[in-house]
Design a protein with these regions (language model features):
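C-terminal peripheral helix-coil segments that are non-catalytic and often amphipathic
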Residues: 1-23, 172, 176-184, 208-212, ...
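Hydrophobic alpha-helical connector segments
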Residues: 85, 99-141, 196-199
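Amphipathic alpha-helical segments used for helix-helix packing
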Residues: 136-157, 208-212
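Generic hydrophobic, amphipathic alpha-helix propensity
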Residues: 36-44, 61, 86-90, 94-98, ...
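Hydrophobic/aromatic residues within well-ordered alpha-helical segments
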Residues: 36, 79, 86, 90, ...
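Helix-turn-helix
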Residues: 39, 47-81, 85
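Amphipathic alpha-helical packing segments from all-alpha helical-bundle domains
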Residues: 99, 118, 122, 144-147, ...
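Short, hydrophobic secondary-structure boundary micro-motifs
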Residues: 57, 110, 142-147, 156, ...
Length: 270
């Protein structure tokens, strides 16, 4: 090999090596940043779990993590941005859990229901009961979702883009169950989306009475009231009482055979 060719090859190899070093360093920085971001999210979730959504502030996080407030702002532009990310993670956890429930129960419904009408009605009852029980199993996630739906200020476009796709996905899964019940004649014709919104809002509202259950545990038994509300809603949507009784019995059996709210690892275990 002539000296010129050898020199050119050496320069090329050196350039490749330099690029590799730069890429490795960039990858390491990105991993470190992702790990740090996850650390902040876990800290935020702990605050929500211990003291509630209203206690989540950047200063509280900085105190808990022994870091400067400004450091947190390099990862999240505002408290709303941090809260939006927490809500996205929370909603996705609930959604994944619901998908696991559907994957477990759908084959059983097809095999054990008397017909497609009973299967669709049982699936609807299971889905609404799932929503009730997430308040117990995924308390923090449910509180974060409630904070999204009850906030007084308008969600900023950047936060909306961060959170709403996950919320719409969960909403769509619930609406599909309502629509299937309509399509099979299990409940009367109507707007499936409006019914799902009504159900979610009503269940969430009833569950709020748990906050005063210590005054009268029987009167303000939020979960029991919410489960009764599920039956009232489905009956109000036109379900035949005998059909509803059979579908509820099948839903009861399936709930006993596996978790009604399957476990999905959360950010606190990441």
């Amino acid at each position: 090999m002539c000296p010129t060719s050898h020199s050119r090859l050496t320069r090329t190899l050196n350039a490749i090596q330099t690029l590799n070093v730069v890429q490795v360093a960039a990858d390491r920085r990105e991993r470190n940043r992702a790990a740090r971001r996850s650390q902040y999210l876990r800290a935020a979730m702990r605050i929500v779990s211990d003291d509630g959504v209203e206690r989540l502030t950047m200063q509280r996080m900085a105190d808990d993590l022994d870091c400067a407030v400004g450091t947190i702002y390099t990862y999240f532009a505002s408290k709303d941005a941090l809260l939006a990310e927490l809500q996205r993670v929370a909603i996705e956890r609930i959604t994944d859990s619901y998908r696991l429930l559907v994957a477990r129960t759908d084959p059983e419904l097809e095999a054990r229901a008397r017909d497609e009408t009973e299967a669709a009605l049982s699936r609807l009852v299971l889905g609404l009961r799932f929503w009730v029980h997430t308040a117990d199993v995924y308390r923090d996630e449910s509180n974060l979702f409630r904070a999204l739906t009850t906030r007084r200020s308008r969600l900023a476009p950047t936060e909306a883009a961060q959170t709403l796709p996950a919320a719409w996905q969960l909403f769509a899964l619930g609406t599909t169950g309502v629509q299937a019940a309509i399509d099979t004649g299990a409940i009367s014709p109507g707007n499936a989306g409006e019914r799902m919104v009504t159900a979610a809002a009503a269940i969430g509202g009833v569950l709020l009475v748990e906050g005063i259950a210590h005054f009268d545990p029987e009167l303000f038994a939020g979960r029991s009231l919410a489960l009764q509300l599920v039956d009232d809603l489905v009956r109000g949507w036109g379900a035949d009482p005998d059909r509803l009784a059979a579908a509820s019995a099948l839903a009861d059996a399936l709930a006993l055979e596996g978790p009604l709210v399957p476990d999905v690892p959360g950010i606190d275990t990441a």
